[in-house]
Amino acid sequence: MTKQDLMDIIVKVAPGSPLREGVDYILDAGIGALIIIGYDDEVEKVRDGGFLIDCDYTPERIFELSKMDGAIILNDDCSKILYANVHVQPDNSYSTTESGTRHRTAERAAKHLKREVVAISERKKNVTLYKGNLKYRLKNFDELNIEVGQVLKTLESYRHVLNRSLDSLTILELDDLVTVLDVANTLQRFEMVRRISEEITRYLLELGSRGRLVNMQVSELIWDLDEEEESFLKDYIDDETDTDSVRRYLHSLSDSELLEVENVVVALGYSKSSSVFDNKIAAKGYRVLEKISKLTKKDVEKIVNTYKDISEIQEVTDEDFSAIKISKFKIKALRAGINRLKFTIEMQR
């Protein structure tokens, strides 16, 4: 099962969802429950006894039905309660690491049916989610708050480091002093920020409606990440290389592999060797030019396709810009924008 499978389950039991409301009723009452989400022929084969309910789901109804010993079966979107008080008999050949009867049955049923199963422990007062070989215990609100706070601080720190790295890179680009190592270090930081933001997404799903404030903070930190990375990659990879393929390669690296900058250099089309670190490399100019609001994407493409890099673009005369149909107003905005960018970065240092 994939991370997406885990997220799909968490969404169904996140605070604010109808199913979670019913689960909370069950937890507060100090009773347990086993809930199977979805029904098909395979579920019918493992269903023994119980009785047909076939009514609309409400938190109150599932709470009342959980007072009986058997499992509860819901439809795929949890909008209907199909069966209650069911004895579930999954194939015992499926292994389980659980100790309690309810959780052993839940884990085996999830593996057998390839469906989502929710087990609520009356003794430990916790909720465990299963699907296939996937198993995940929901954290309580206090645990989540602590962990989210830690991850959010890490994201803020890494985003700050990335921003400083991009500022330094901008000055190097304008002075024509960029090396392969400078670019690889920045690309490495982009991927680190992306991974931390993906990690916090799972926490936000688990927080559900309680995570609105954190969600706003995360959105503020990463709102321009994709666009900034796209411009950055277009500056340094050759025209035949797809930016998505670079991202896929970086995503395939383990955390420890990502920390080795030699692996990141490969994404830029260089050999996996430190000997290339000091090689000079020039930015085409996408990232810098796209920060100048008066230039359209068409203008940026025209300039980048005409001149080889941002260093050369700074030396182009007004007449040469006019020759490629860049207006005097935009030429002035371009020059002022680059000077303002330099000044702003220097003031922030």
Swiss-Prot record:
Concerning its family, UniProt says: Belongs to the DisA family.
Q: Which SUPFAM superfamilies match?
A: YojJ-like
Q: Which GO terms describe its molecular function?
A: adenylate cyclase activity; ATP binding; diadenylate cyclase activity; DNA binding
Which reaction equation describes what this protein catalyses?
Answer: 2 ATP = 3',3'-c-di-AMP + 2 diphosphate
One BP term from GO? DNA repair
Q: Which PROSITE patterns match?
A: DAC
Chain residues that bind ATP = 70, 88, 101-105
Annotated gene: disA
The protein's name is DNA integrity scanning protein DisA
Keyword check for Nucleotide-binding, yes or no: yes
Keywords, in A-Z order: ATP-binding, DNA damage, DNA repair, DNA-binding, Magnesium, Nucleotide-binding, Nucleotidyltransferase, Transferase
Which organism was this protein described from? Fusobacterium nucleatum subsp. nucleatum (strain ATCC 25586 / DSM 15643 / BCRC 10681 / CIP 101130 / JCM 8532 / KCTC 2640 / LMG 13131 / VPI 4355)
EC number(s) given by UniProt:
2.7.7.85
Q: Report the InterPro entries cross-referenced here.
A: DisA (IPR050338), DisA_sf (IPR038331), DNA_integrity_DisA_N_sf (IPR036888), DNA_integrity_scan_DisA_link (IPR018906), DNA_integrity_scan_DisA_N (IPR003390), DNA_integrity_scanning_protein (IPR023763)
